[in-house]
C-alpha cells in the first residue's frame, strides 16, 4: 500500500515576498510532499503590486529554494482559504508566526477555518530568529524612505520595489 501524499498550502498576500516568507516555505517543504504557495488577491489590503506581479516574484524566489524533495507550486487564489486548500487536496495549511500579535489573528483564523472544515489542520511555524521581525509592510516603508532592504527580500524583489518607488516618485 502506498503512503498517502502529504499536501499543504501556504497562503499569503506576498506584497512583496520576503526572506521571512521564503524561510517558512523552505521549512514547510521539509514536512510535506507537495506544497502549494497560494498568492491571495486580497484587494482589501491595497497591494503595491498586482496579483500577476506578486505571483511572478514568488515563483522566481521559490525556484531558487531547496525543495527537500517536495514539489512546490505557486498559484493565485481569490476564494476562501479553506476552499482553496480543499481544491489543492491539502490536509494542512501552514502559517508563520512572528510575534504575539500574529498569534491572536492566526488563532482566530484557525478557529474559523476549523469550523469550515475540521479535516484540514493549521500548522504554525515560528519565524526563525533571523526573520522574526521582517514584514512586507516594514520592507515597503523602509524601501520607500530610502533604507537598505537587501537583507529582507531576494535581490529580484528588491529591484522591483526600488523600480516601483522610483516610478511613484516620478509620477507624484
Curated annotation (Swiss-Prot):
By sequence similarity, the record places it as follows: Belongs to the bacterial CoaD family.
Locate the site labelled Transition state stabilizer.
21
Q: Where does substrate bind?
A: 13, 45, 81, 95
- Molecular function terms, GO-annotated: ATP binding; pantetheine-phosphate adenylyltransferase activity
Gene (name only): coaD
Subunit comment: Homohexamer.
Q: What is this protein called?
A: Phosphopantetheine adenylyltransferase
One Pfam family assigned to this protein is: CTP_transf_like
Amino acid at each position: 500500500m502506498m503512503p498517502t501524499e502529504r499536501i499543504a498550502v501556504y497562503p499569503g498576500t506576498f506584497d512583496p515576498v520576503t526572506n521571512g516568507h521564503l524561510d517558512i516555505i523552505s521549512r514547510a517543504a521539509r514536512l510535506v510532499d507537495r506544497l502549494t504557495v497560494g498568492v491571495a488577491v486580497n484587494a482589501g489590503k491595497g497591494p503595491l503590486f498586482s496579483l500577476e506581479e506578486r505571483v511572478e516574484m514568488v515563483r522566481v524566489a521559490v525556484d531558487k529554494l531547496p525543495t527537500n524533495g517536495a514539489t512546490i507550486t505557486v498559484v493565485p487564489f481569490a476564494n476562501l482559504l479553506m476552499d482553496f486548500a480543499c481544491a489543492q487536496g491539502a490536509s494542512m495549511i501552514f502559517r508563520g508566526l512572528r510575534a504575539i500579535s500574529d498569534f491572536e489573528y492566526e488563532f482566530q483564523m484557525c478557529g474559523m477555518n476549523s469550523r469550515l472544515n475540521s479535516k484540514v489542520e493549521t500548522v504554525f511555524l515560528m519565524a526563525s530568529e533571523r526573520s522574526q521581525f521582517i514584514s512586507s509592510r516594514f520592507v515597503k516603508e523602509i524601501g520607500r524612505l530610502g533604507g537598505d532592504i537587501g537583507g529582507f527580500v531576494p535581490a529580484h524583489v528588491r529591484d522591483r520595489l526600488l523600480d516601483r518607488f522610483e516610478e511613484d516618485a516620478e509620477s507624484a
